[in-house]
Amino acid sequence: MDYRTVFRLDGACAAVTGAGSGIGLEICRAFAASGARLILIDREAAALDRAAQELGAAVAARIVADVTDAEAMTAAAAEAEAVAPVSILVNSAGIARLHDALETDDATWRQVMAVNVDGMFWASRAFGRAMVARGAGAIVNLGSMSGTIVNRPQFASSYMASKGAVHQLTRALAAEWAGRGVRVNALAPGYVATEMTLKMRERPELFETWLDMTPMGRCGEPSEIAAAALFLASPAASYVTGAILAVDGGYTVW
């Protein structure tokens, strides 16, 4: 192992869902800086255009697709493979909804599960086929510390349940594909300063509790999550599969 290049992704082609914004976009920045070619996937065409313009020559293709559509993910994988063999998949697309369980409507529950769980499986299955056939690949899933603990003071049963499912899906695929050369791992971020958490961070009754319960006393930055994703996708993690890597400022050590 060459320690000078072990975190590089030169020659790799990485497909990233949710690539148009937030942590997904930050992961694209990290991968591009490390030499990867990128397949950007997002349901928002305008967000993809902005991301592609920023990332420039690193972008091999941009695909407008909704992860909740299984057929769209199959088509996206085929389109991506026609450009270059995809050796890395990052499942970053995700949503969160705050709600009390007794007041949760069916549509909200189904939407969260459709994006966070179904979408991750559809994408993993679609891109995993070629990886398994080639005998090589790495998948990085965006889980959450919410898949391990119960958040407070806010309630979000659908989000927590979905991220618990993400962690188990990660382990299941890791076990199934380990002997076929494909590694599958997940990140479990804590509270991160993204657009998705902005409205919650502006509520003192939530934000102050978050900081009090985080040993490091602050939110994470998207770049800190992207750096962890880079590790899991890179040759540096060649003997790592089925891991749920906490990147939460120590929140889950309590």
From Swiss-Prot:
Keywords: Magnesium, Metal-binding, NAD, Nucleotide-binding, Oxidoreductase. The active site is at 159 (proton acceptor). The wide substrate spectrum and the stereoselective mode of action make GDH a very interesting enzyme for the production of optically pure building blocks in the chemical synthesis of bioactive compounds. GDH could be covalently immobilized via thiol bonds onto the surface of a gold electrode, which represents a proof-of-concept for the development of reactors for electrochemical synthon preparation using dehydrogenases. It catalyses: galactitol + NAD(+) = keto-L-tagatose + NADH + H(+). Its EC number is 1.1.1.406. Can use Mg(2+), Mn(2+), Ni(2+) or Co(2+). Optimum pH is 10.5 with 1,2-hexanediol as substrate. Optimum pH is 4.0 with acetoin as substrate. Inhibited by the chelating agents EDTA and alpha,alpha'-dipyridyl. Inhibited by Zn(2+) and Fe(2+). It comes from the Bacteria. NAD(+) binds at residues 21-23, 42, 66-67, 159, 163, 192-194. SUPFAM superfamilies: NAD(P)-binding Rossmann-fold domains (SSF51735). Belongs to the short-chain dehydrogenases/reductases (SDR) family. Catalyzes the interconversion of galactitol to the rare sugar L-tagatose. Shows activity with a wide range of substrates, and catalyzes the oxidation of a variety of polyvalent aliphatic alcohols and polyols to the corresponding ketones and ketoses, respectively, and in the reverse reaction, it reduces ketones with high stereoselectivity yielding the corresponding S-configurated alcohols. Shows high activity with D-threitol, xylitol, 1,2-hexanediol, 1,2-pentanediol, 2-hexanol, L-erythrulose, D-ribulose and acetoin. Specific for NAD(+). This is Galactitol 2-dehydrogenase (L-tagatose-forming).
